[in-house]
Amino acid sequence: MEKEKTMLETAEKRLESLTKIPALKKGNSIAKMLKNHGISRRDFMKWAASMTAMLSLPASFAPLTAKAAEVADRLPVIWLHMAECTGCSESLLRSDGPGIASLIFDYISLEYHETLMAASGFQAEENLQSAIERYKGRYVLMVEGGVPTALDGQYLTIGAHGHTGLESAKYASEHAAAIFAIGTCSSFGGIQAANPNPTAAKPLSAVTNKPVINVPGCPPSEKNIVGNVIHFILFGTLPSLDAFNRPKWAYGLRIHDLCERRGHFDAGEFVQSFGDEGAKQGYCLYKVGCKGPYTFNNCSKLRFNSHTSWPIQAGHGCIGCSEPNFWDTMGPFEEPMASRLYDTPLFGGADRTADNIGITILGAAAIGMAAHAVLSNIKKDKE
């Protein structure tokens, strides 16, 4: 309780200080934006409660999460593109019915984003320079894509002056209040850094000495992107991170831990080939290459396309896209990993194949059911 009280006080002071800063977008408000999109205040508060839970914060933070969204227009954001496909931006922006998370991102003062802005050429470069100078030490930097470093970064040149991505990433990072590597390419190098990596592409964290919060995924969920922004607005600090600098609230559990097909894994029921009877029954996809047991992410909870579905629900196994070097270490994507058999504490930490796990768990389940029956009979006799 004492820790929760301290966190609440910290967040309240942080939000109070942000409220005193003039809004960067004049004549706009969260209430007006929600009304224009037909979203009620009740739905907004439900979203705030859901976001609070997702961030692993106590339920008492829900009103503060809502307040954080309301003052998000005080937060200048600069979004840079490096070597990538723009899929992370598409994940956030392309929706036939934008959710509240997408709308919150629209509400934020996005000072620079090459995909969205009208300016180009010299004018675009002037806009970037102006935003960095105007909000020096205040802006949030989001970088999408790996950073080529070979030939002093000449494999990626951007804009009218031909600055390298390496130069731009270093310069923008130097003056940022917080830095987020959006997507696996920016977090870990991505496909650009896959063997043989001729451009010597590296993650953002390798080219700056500033702390970087990795938000991997190919692409990451829009909620994970916006959730990190909300956390920064609330506390002004980094969230609790794992060994790969990923927020634990989003990447603390494996895909396997929360998968809707987990029961079939435990029961030894596996898809043997795509399109077979097991596939039609929704059996576990481990034998056809699912990397869920090795991948840390919250896809099964958040899903994609306005919470419609996600790869495993659609019938294809996880490819481990939020893990470092997954292009080199997780393939072939439609085959189980012979070199990294699933490790489970149920068997004393020993590696097991899918077949062995299923058979052993079936045996354990039978023993458990028999024990339950015996205990039930004993209870009845006593009654």
Question: Residue locations for each model-derived region?
Answer:
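Short cysteine/histidine-rich metal-coordination sites, predominantly Zn2+-binding motifs
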Residues: 277-278, 302-311, 332-342
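N-terminal secretory signal peptides
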Residues: 1-39, 67
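Juxtamembrane/start-of-transmembrane alpha-helix segments at the extracytoplasmic/lumenal side
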Residues: 347-360
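Local cysteine-cluster metal-coordination motifs and their immediate loop/turn environment
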Residues: 83-89, 184, 188, 260, ...
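Alpha-helical transmembrane segments
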Residues: 364-377
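N-terminal export signals
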Residues: 43-65
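A conserved mid-domain beta-alpha-beta active-site/ligand-binding segment of alpha/beta enzyme cores
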Residues: 230, 234-303
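Extended, subdomain-level signal for the structured scaffold at the beginning of enzyme domains
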Residues: 45, 63-169, 368
